[in-house]
């Protein structure tokens, strides 16, 4: 609960979940009703926070996160750039190997917001877009939203 609260407070404000949702849903975003969009954004945000904090808790085995676990690389961007990629490396426990983690951000309304994260070259947006497209074909958008809500409830019980 402590790590989830930390993520809610320090991570969520820096992610544009509406933009991420648009990218993840693709064509389905355009045909979704405003209510479906709102519900999807809420459940998807809850899912991402719960899923990744659960993974972080497992990674750290419940202990504090070591200071040297993540290293950010120098930013390569121009002064007028509106989109940038911030690269980092995350150490694996018990290994000298580091996993590349890249954050894609865009500048709007005077602030930078994350719209995608790639772990070891695999985009969160692309992964969910593929997975959710199959689920939408099988169950419809409302079915996907219901499934996310159910998964969130399961993650809340952990």
Model-derived segments and their meaning:
Residues 1-56:
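Early exported N-terminus immediately downstream of N-terminal targeting peptides
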Residues 7, 12, 64-67, 116, ...:
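Short, functionally important structural connectors and interaction interfaces within domains
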Residues 14, 19-22, 28, 118-127, ...:
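Residue-level preference for alpha-helix termini and adjacent loops
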Residues 98-126:
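Short beta-strand edge/turn micro-motifs at domain boundaries
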Residues 121-158:
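Non-transmembrane domains of secretory- and envelope-associated proteins
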């Amino acid at each position: 609960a402590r790590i989830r609260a930390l993520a809610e407070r320090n991570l969520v404000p820096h992610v544009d979940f509406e933009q991420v949702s648009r990218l993840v849903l693709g064509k389905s975003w355009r045909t979704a009703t405003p209510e479906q969009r709102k519900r999807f954004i809420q459940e998807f945000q809850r899912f991402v926070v719960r899923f990744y904090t659960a993974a972080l808790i497992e990674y750290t085995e419940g202990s504090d996160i070591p200071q040297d676990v993540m290293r950010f690389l120098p930013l390569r961007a121009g002064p007028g750039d509106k989109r940038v990629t911030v690269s980092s490396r995350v150490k694996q426990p018990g290994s000298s190997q580091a996993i590349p983690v890249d954050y894609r951000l865009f500048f709007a309304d005077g602030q930078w917001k994350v719209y995608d994260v790639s772990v070891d070259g695999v985009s969160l947006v692309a992964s969910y877009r593929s997975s959710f497209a199959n689920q939408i074909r099988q169950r419809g958008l409302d079915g996907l939203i219901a499934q996310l809500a159910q998964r969130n409830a399961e993650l809340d019980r952990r």
